[in-house]
Amino acid sequence: MKLINIWLLLLVVLLCGKKHLGDRLGKKAFEKASCPSCSHLTLKVEFSSTVVEYEYIVAFNGYFTAKARNSFISSALKSSEVDNWRIIPRNNPSSDYPSDFEVIQIKEKQKAGLLTLEDHPNIKRVTPQRKVFRSLKFAESDPIVPCNETRWSQKWQSSRPLRRASLSLGSGFWHATGRHSSRRLLRAIPRQVAQTLQADVLWQMGYTGANVRVAVFDTGLSEKHPHFKNVKERTNWTNERTLDDGLGHGTFVAGVIASMRECQGFAPDAELHIFRVFTNNQVSYTSWFLDAFNYAILKKIDVLNLSIGGPDFMDHPFVDKVWELTANNVIMVSAIGNDGPLYGTLNNPADQMDVIGVGGIDFEDNIARFSSRGMTTWELPGGYGRVKPDIVTYGAGVRGSGVKGGCRALSGTSVASPVVAGAVTLLVSTVQKRELVNPASVKQALIASARRLPGVNMFEQGHGKLDLLRAYQILSSYKPQASLSPSYIDLTECPYMWPYCSQPIYYGGMPTIVNVTILNGMGVTGRIVDKPEWRPYLPQNGDNIEVAFSYSSVLWPWSGYLAISISVTKKAASWEGIAQGHIMITVASPAETEAKNGAEHTSTVKLPIKVKIIPTPPRSKRVLWDQYHNLRYPPGYFPRDNLRMKNDPLDWNGDHVHTNFRDMYQHLRSMGYFVEVLGAPFTCFDATQYGTLLMVDSEEEYFPEEIAKLRRDVDNGLSLVIFSDWYNTSVMRKVKFYDENTRQWWMPDTGGANIPALNELLSVWNMGFSDGLYEGEFALANHDMYYASGCSIAKFPEDGVVITQTFKDQGLEVLKQETAVVENVPILGLYQIPAEGGGRIVLYGDSNCLDDSHRQKDCFWLLDALLQYTSYGVTPPSLSHSGNRQRPPSGAGLAPPERMEGNHLHRYSKVLEAHLGDPKPRPLPACPHLSWAKPQPLNETAPSNLWKHQKLLSIDLDKVVLPNFRSNRPQVRPLSPGESGAWDIPGGIMPGRYNQEVGQTIPVFAFLGAMVALAFFVVQISKAKSRPKRRRPRAKRPQLTQQTHPPRTPSV
């Protein structure tokens, strides 16, 4: 009976233990996904924004009370005819303080009232109120196969789909992997990221983020979450009456920064300030962010994490407020975006100079596929983008706090961003002289200490991987100074300096522009003293290059730019070799104390330059890319070129050879062509230097002077290759949509390309495109091709070569959901100008085969064949003798495509006057003129290796000695078949803190083991008591054998 009771007791203990473990595993499984297949899905957090009709943000020149703001608006509107207006109340924690903006509602559509407001001396700007949406969407985790539906199905959202990048991806949100480097399953393994970056070394030195105020702008945080002990304040900026996190994203971000147990954060003792700026329906407004930003300034926040972003770097109220935040010493850390591996996909505000933009890597130090790539596109078309991201860190499979406790693993740059924010918070707590900490000094320490990843260019990794301990060493001995990003220019260093290293420079070429960021750790404002100085090294042929400068007149806040144009002197037109020199700039900032009357702090920085020069290539090998006539979002609604890609409605990557046409550029370079970029009108280049002008996906209009000059250039030997795209006003009206939230129609400003403008350009040669819209797969010259939402050729000279194909009428499918097949659609035309020495013209109706954004089948082979034709006059036999060659269309009876009535292209065009009515061109702008710097030659040898870790002045890392602590590193076990990615990875325990995960798991198994052992001994004792006693037999005397010692056998 006792034995039965013992076994019953053991069974109860085992069942209780099984239930306890099952509850924990079930909770994790629920947090991971709600369906068994979720480990194979991705849940993308996408952002979109709309303009709220009738609502406007009125920004003032200073901070005023509510009464004063009301008075300013009332007096401004008094003289106008606007009567139906009101100030929208904002009930949030900042309502009791002065503000620099107001939200008003004007029900009348007259713009006179807005203009009257802007005329008021205390009003800075009036901009539309924007509504921000965040949506969670499951999709296949394989990003290679694009969304390509076989039948048209128009499913517009009720908000303007200005696509915001996925900044949070995780198991539970998304499952992500890094780059597949070999033929094996590569999973994002959840890690204790704080200890992987050796934060435990600083913990054991006594630094845990104490006395540092860190703000998390996200979805809120529950009041009694077990992971946080120092939540100083929770504020709600939404229209919902709750402070709790109903989604889990804000909890996760806060946990990565400051969790004190289980999945430990970097700075558990930091003061957490939680700003709930998104509702449970994932909606926010620009005004909510502005109020919250103002409150963050008021609360003297030290570090602010913003794990959101989007492509709209022209949302002026938001951008201006970010500048104001950093000017008030708030260190902002923001996610760079999840639109990789495509280039030119950086998100705002992470692409701003004063913000630390963070990209993502996996735990094998591969750039995460989802991480957005540079360059910035603010500067196009006339300039060149800056280096971003600033640094990269772990963003795939990172563990953080669950919404109700426990841990979960997420991936995305919105995960990498709080990793850096947490590291910065920890670093700030180590600095004794807190007055030295500012957005510039922290950024300088991070990029100077970053570890460069091999085989990765600067537009993927920035300055490299976050190195927490080296950053600590730098900050510990930091002295205020200026620095540069990048810290040197080496156009021979590949792959890091791609694309600069991909093409040497030569005489007569377009100047190479390098956009350098100046970081000023001495003060929020600064200036460049005198002018930058160019000092060529004579022994290294530095006198063979010349440089010109453009730079910020004022460095604010904490930063500015230095644009360097590099060109080759005439004497080196036939020379080949390496040329070197350096630029010297001196930055000055006002002294902080008023006692120093007019005193300034100064810092002099050297920027080494190294370039490779070759003799000027022949004209036939030089291709000029037209950048000036490409338009993008922001600010206009320029639709995608492939209408099948409804999940990416905007053309926002810049259409540059180093962004979404990167693969095409790489191919042309591999074929021996030299590609230059024209960021000015056609009147600003010497056509005798180039064999082909390449115009791809052009949305801009043309000056009359450009049309006349291009005709002369083609007559004199310049060839023209045009890749067009769809344009159809009926389809444009169809793809407009009604926003139910704003009760407003959104209309494209043009089609995929501006066909009416192109036809005006081509009319002198009797050529033109139609407004037909076609799609389909076909074969040409034994190559598989795909025509994605392209147009056809409407007319072409009779002595030209025209290739036709059979396609589906996609326009009919869009407009009427009907399917029809059209034969003999003219898509490719080749024409030789009959005049002696004339050039050649090629037309093709679709650019998607060159564009990296949604390319399904490339047509690089066709581009090669066309350039052979335009450069050397050799018509490819595969085209001239093709069975698809047809008689060129005459265009008789076809009405040319017209510009859509009421379009707003004039608002964003560099060519058209900004007014309604018939389009009229502006006056032709002057061509850019560079003022070359006067050289100050140096008769000394240049340094042989320009790549060093960016050494800040007066910093000696050897003086800052780190203690030799033995820290536990997370152990990784291999992935079993069918196992999910949400693993429990053992990690070290923070000194002085109880690891709840280990504390929950180990006692359970210890208790079960003790009970099993106890039961075993009880059973043995019971058996022994019930066994009858035996008389011990007398021991027998052993018999002697001949073999006294056993044989020796080898021990194993």
Curated annotation (Swiss-Prot):
Cytoplasmic-facing ranges: 1023-1052
Transmembrane segments: 1000-1022
Signal peptide positions (record): 1-17
This protein's record includes keyword Signal: yes
Cofactor: Ca(2+)
EC number: 3.4.21.112
PTM per Swiss-Prot/TrEMBL: The 148 kDa zymogen is processed progressively into two membrane-bound 120 and 106 kDa forms in the endoplasmic reticulum, and late into a secreted 98 kDa form. The propeptide is autocatalytically removed through an intramolecular cleavage after Leu-186. Further cleavage generates 14, 10, and 8 kDa intermediates.
Modified residues (Phosphoserine): S168
Site (Cleavage): L186, R187
A Gene Ontology molecular function term of the record: serine-type endopeptidase activity
Glycosylated residues, chain numbering: N148, N236, N305, N515, N728, N939
Gene3D superfamilies (UniProt xref): Peptidase S8/S53 domain
Lumenal compartment spans: 187-999
Regulation: Inhibited by divalent copper and zinc ions, but not by nickel or cobalt. Inhibited by its prosegment, but not smaller fragments. Inhibited by 4-(2-aminoethyl)benzenesulfonyl fluoride (AEBSF), a serine protease inhibitor.
Major localisation: endoplasmic reticulum
UniProt feature, compositional bias: Basic residues: 1025-1037
One example of a Gene Ontology biological process annotation: protein processing
Region of interest: Disordered: 877-900, 1025-1052
The UniProt record lists the keyword Protease: yes
Location of the protein in the cell: Endoplasmic reticulum membrane; Golgi apparatus membrane
Membrane topology annotation: Single-pass type I membrane protein
Database matches in InterPro entries: MBTP1_N (IPR055143), MBTPS1_3rd (IPR057060), MBTPS1_4th (IPR057032), Peptidase_S8/S53_dom (IPR000209), Peptidase_S8/S53_dom_sf (IPR036852), Peptidase_S8_His-AS (IPR022398), Peptidase_S8_Ser-AS (IPR023828), Peptidase_S8_subtilisin-like (IPR050131)
GO cellular component: endoplasmic reticulum membrane; Golgi membrane; Golgi stack
Function: Serine protease that cleaves after hydrophobic or small residues, provided that Arg or Lys is in position P4: known substrates include SREBF1/SREBP1, SREBF2/SREBP2, BDNF, GNPTAB, ATF6, ATF6B and FAM20C. Cleaves substrates after Arg-Ser-Val-Leu (SREBP2), Arg-His-Leu-Leu (ATF6), Arg-Gly-Leu-Thr (BDNF) and its own propeptide after Arg-Arg-Leu-Leu. Catalyzes the first step in the proteolytic activation of the sterol regulatory element-binding proteins (SREBPs) SREBF1/SREBP1 and SREBF2/SREBP2.
Protein name: Membrane-bound transcription factor site-1 protease
Gene behind this protein: MBTPS1
